[in-house]
UniProtKB/Swiss-Prot annotation:
UniProt record similarity statement: Belongs to the O2 superfamily. Contryphan family.
D-tryptophan found at: W6
GO cellular component: extracellular region
PROSITE patterns reported in the protein's UniProt record: CONTRYPHAN
Protein name listed in UniProt: Contryphan-Ar4
Length: 10
């Protein structure tokens, strides 16, 4: 995903 500031599996 592009929005990855909120999930730690990025």
């Amino acid at each position: 995903e592009s929005e990855c500031p909120w999930h730690p599996w990025c």
